[in-house]
């Protein structure tokens, strides 16, 4: 019996460095279509030739503190399997890059994902960077940075499910193809809202456990979830990741959305920090840093140009 995977363990395998090849080119096709605290390091020396970006909005001078779940948080931020005292992940690298431009140190602050917004509003850190999505409810209490990654929702089914025979990751599929099925996703995920739009779909939410094991065990019919998570856990994209032969991604990613950095709207410091972070992200988009990070984590695709990443 395969143990259940919680959100953090689940995320631990999604989108790291390139080089893996899935039979039939599935990984390459998919990526082309998609979209206690551990010391985080991060130097304080600004990038040569670049005017340092302001850091007046920080809670603690010299320290850029961002909330995230690292326990099982791959590919976003998680302990390096070969050195658990060191964090890795694409958002970890983005945090370091922003801090370097600002001449400060980046520090991830551990917090449970389900309590992340409450911690942000209690000013436990400067901002949230954890695959954070903009929603109408969050916009009531949060400010948001410009988008730093564009992704789509991905359908996953059992590889031997005859109902989806002939369906590949290049098929044009959507919500209507899930009607009549029980579909799993993570609680508080964007996919949960999307599935809720169609009353002919039975949605099963997972918190803290996540749906891949239940899918493999025939307890649900499909999963709908962020593309980067599927790339890591199902397709095996990234160092240390392993493809799951019992499952397959079908259909092109749809309902594209973006990841943002969130700030507490009621905190006066956030009014200062948000434009500083936006300035840093703008530099990282134009100088190739973000593209380099996403290439390393097998997350680069043409959709990133739509949000200004070069």
Language model region names:
Residues 46-131, 140:
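Extracytoplasmic small-molecule ligand-binding "clamshell" domains
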Residues 71-73, 85-101, 154-207, 211-212, ...:
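Bilobed "Venus flytrap"/periplasmic-binding protein-like clamshell domains
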Residues 93-101, 160-162, 189, 258-301:
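Extended ligand-binding regions for polar small-molecule ligands
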Residues 150-154, 235-278, 300-310:
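Periplasmic-binding protein-like
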Residues 1-12, 16-34:
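N-terminal secretory signal peptides
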Residues 114-115, 132-140, 196-197, 221-256:
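A ligand-binding cleft/hinge motif common to bilobed small-molecule-binding domains
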Residues 35-44:
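Bacterial lipoprotein signal-peptidase II cleavage site
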Residues 105-175:
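Acidic, polar ligand-binding/catalytic clefts
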């Amino acid at each position: 019996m395969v143990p259940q995977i919680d959100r953090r363990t689940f995320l631990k395998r999604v989108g790291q460095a390139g080089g893996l090849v899935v039979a039939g080119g599935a990984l390459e096709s998919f990526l082309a279509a998609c979209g206690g605290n551990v010391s985080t390091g991060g130097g304080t020396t600004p990038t040569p030739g670049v005017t340092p970006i302001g850091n007046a909005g920080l809670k603690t001078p010299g320290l850029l503190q961002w909330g995230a779940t690292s326990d099982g948080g791959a590919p976003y931020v998680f302990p390096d399997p070969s050195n658990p005292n060191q964090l890795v992940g694409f958002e970890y690298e983005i945090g370091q890059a922003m801090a370097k431009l600002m001449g400060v140190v980046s520090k991830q602050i551990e917090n449970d994902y389900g309590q992340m917004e409450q911690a942000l509003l209690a000013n436990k850190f400067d901002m949230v960077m954890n695959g954070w999505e903009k929603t109408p409810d969050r916009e009531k209490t949060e400010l948001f940075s410009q988008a730093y990654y564009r992704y789509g929702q991905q359908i996953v089914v059992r590889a031997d499910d005859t109902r989806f025979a002939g369906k590949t990751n290049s098929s044009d599929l959507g919500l209507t193809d899930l009607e009549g099925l029980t579909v799993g996703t993570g609680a508080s995920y964007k996919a949960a809202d999307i599935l809720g739009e169609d009353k002919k779909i039975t949605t099963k939410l997972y918190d803290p456990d996540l749906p891949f094991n239940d899918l493999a065990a025939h307890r649900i019919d499909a999963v709908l979830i962020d593309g980067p998570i599927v790339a890591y856990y199902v397709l095996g994209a990234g160092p240390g990741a392993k493809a799951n032969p019992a499952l397959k991604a079908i259909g092109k990613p749809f309902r594209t959305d973006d990841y943002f950095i969130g700030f507490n709207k009621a905190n006066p410091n956030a009014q200062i920090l948000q434009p500083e972070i936006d300035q840093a992200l703008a530099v990282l988009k134009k100088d190739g840093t973000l593209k380099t990070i996403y290439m390393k984590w097998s997350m680069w695709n043409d959709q990133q140009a739509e949000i200004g990443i070069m």
